[in-house]
Amino acid sequence: MSTSQPTPVRGRFAPSPSGRMHLGNLCCALLAWLSVRSQNGEMLLRIEDLDPDRCTREKAELLMNDLSWLGLTWDEGPGHERTHAPYYQSARRELYESALSELRAKNDVYPCFCTRAELHAVSAPHAGDGTFRYPGLCRNLTPAEAEEKSRTRRPSLRFRAPDKSVTFEDLYCGPQNINVQSMFGDFIVRRSDGVHAYQLAVTVDDALMGVTEVVRGRDLLPSTGCQMQLFHALGRTPPHYGHIPLLVNRDGRRLSKRERDLDIGVLRTRFTPEELLGRMANLLGFLDRPEKITLTELIPVYKTWFKNTGTPKFPENCVVPDNFAIK
């Protein structure tokens, strides 16, 4: 009698090299790394550089240097090439086009000729957060109508989002129920300028790279519904997801790369890796004090915290004290 072996945990960190990492990026990377290492899994590094106007190889090299300084190593990725290369999304466009061809064959995508201005004129922001739901203006165009419109305007491509809820158990937030159609409508998978959209690229990459666990910021929680629908449309099994709280200042404003004191470049001049790790672990709630600690020491601490903490494991937002970057 044969027994099936559990699938090894395979996590990933997939930053965008648009600037120096800030504290929020570092917390995501740390939690993704700790979750994988606490399960004896593998870590993948992927560089999400689809936006040529903001992302450069130089910034990617700096990003990897910062991760290495903190000790957040990866088993596969740039510098550790294995079977899933290339690891820069800008070099994976043929894979995204292949996925689009598969979706086209099932009529799961369609051309959209709407401009941003036209959509703003007919839509209201969803839930007041600035997100617009696409009202389906081009969903039922005939081939002849689409051909006529394409003579004067290059279309984007949208995915036909099923009008049903996506449910999953978030590692940190607990049970989730997302209706993509009611929240976003049919979402873009390739922009009108030919750049593949985040939702498609990240889904294709996670599927082809064998990712089984994704830890990232809570701002991406709604996107999980879109990605899970794409996984199912492509006949793939989605990974397990965990979303961590957004970092905010005491006024409740979300931290950004403009917070210079919380930029990794500044933090590296003020702290050793062990000092910074201790402060981050204290901020996230699994160390009582912001004391120096190594990654090796943090793994069992995280494991105990995860086992003993109820769900949700974090508050929705995490307030960064004013003196975080003061030694």
Annotate each PLM feature:
Residues 117-256, 263-267, 319-327:
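Active-site cores that bind ATP or allylic diphosphates and position pyrophosphate for catalysis
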Residues 51-61, 249-251, 300-309:
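Short, mixed-charge aromatic SLiMs
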Residues 1-20, 38-43, 70, 147-148, ...:
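Non-catalytic terminal extensions that flank enzyme cores
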Residues 48, 79, 243, 267-268:
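Sparse recognition of residues in long alpha-helices and their boundaries
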Residues 78-93, 111-126, 148-159, 274-289, ...:
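Hydrophobic transmembrane alpha-helix bundles
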Residues 22, 85-90, 151-153, 199-204, ...:
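Noncatalytic linker/hinge segments flanking ATPase motor cores
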